[in-house]
Amino acid sequence: MMNVNAAYAEKCVTPDEAVTLITSGSHLSMGMFAAEPPALLNALAKRAKRGEINDLRVYCYETASIAGNTIFRYELSDYIHLYSMFITGIERALIRQGIESSGRKIVNYVPSNFHQATRLLADDIGIDTFIHTVSPMDKYGYLNFGTGNDYSTRIARTAKKLIVEVNKYMPRVHGEGAAIHISEIDAIVENHVPLIELPIRTAVAEDIAISQIIASLVPDGACLQMGIGALPELICNALKEHNDLGVHTEALNPGLVSLIQQGVVTNQRKNIDRGMSVFTFAMGQKDMYDYLNDNPSFFSRPVDYVNDPGIIAQNENVVSINATLQIDLTGACNSEHLLGHQYSASGGQLDFVRGAYASKGGRSIITTRSTAANDTISRIVPRLEGPVTTPRTDTHWIVTEFGSVNLKGLSSTERALRIIELAHPNFRQQLRVDAKKMHLI
């Protein structure tokens, strides 16, 4: 029988020693958000600064401040190359810095739907080394991926090398593949620091109106998916009088956890994973992370399961709620591109748009405020300025602060007229002119 404590001690090294396993010219990936390992990333940044590593490609999703303050700094961009599947403020800042400093492109965007991330990383890209923050080892020799199942639990096992950072603040989360044995790990570092937390954003009046409209579209017994931010929190608050809701979501947020604690979410009407709130990654604050710890009502699963439209559709009355940046007069949505640059990503939006509509009684909801930049720019546009994230043929419900519309079954003329009604009044007349020029009305 393996002595797990001896194995742990043998593999426990300093961060500087651990990152020597990461070689020049290799492909590295890491955990998302709170699962980014700060000690390892800091040691890796120091190696790059000393010129000890070159041409390292880092493939990531939902980059957080830990990576932004260490390996993803402009001065290291000659040595460490960023390949992002989901653009955040970290990448946007680097994009601006690259343009302003040298005109050089230093952020590479990898288009994908989130449910494909595991296959892309394992088969198409090929990850050499994977790094992740984990909870401490139990007496049986298992550590836990905590807040990040997503692609992590799969890639940790397909990468050539696995380095973990043990942190007592990382919760132990029940889930598929969430526990990993000491025998599967190449190196361990210890670093007990509080996990990074999701910032609390201030709501605006338009979001309050949108949240009320969306809540009215959610029936009792619905199975929910939504994202992260001020609007999802408002929507959750507006759902507190609902009954028997379920959770099958890409992102677990504080609002959903609050509904679970209040008994609004029971998961008893789900066809699959009944009784459990299923998610693929969690982002919140310390109290939420503490509530997740060893809580059997939560179950994390890999993203190729959670975001698979065929899996999503197995539950009835799925309601997916996602945001967009632009909606055109045909119903197509651009949720990722702004002012000529990649601003966000496709993420799991299309996964859940398709899965929700395929669900019996399900509906997908795409939402946006009607304007941006202090009401000077309309988010309802004649034609999209960027790529299509959700095609017009997939768009179901659209919601702005001015109302909602179900586009399914409407002609192109009916769509254009109804979408214009959701635009800010200051832009409706011009949109009607544009619609006529496009022969939509």
Locate predicted features.
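Conserved alpha/beta enzyme-core scaffold
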Residues: M1-I441
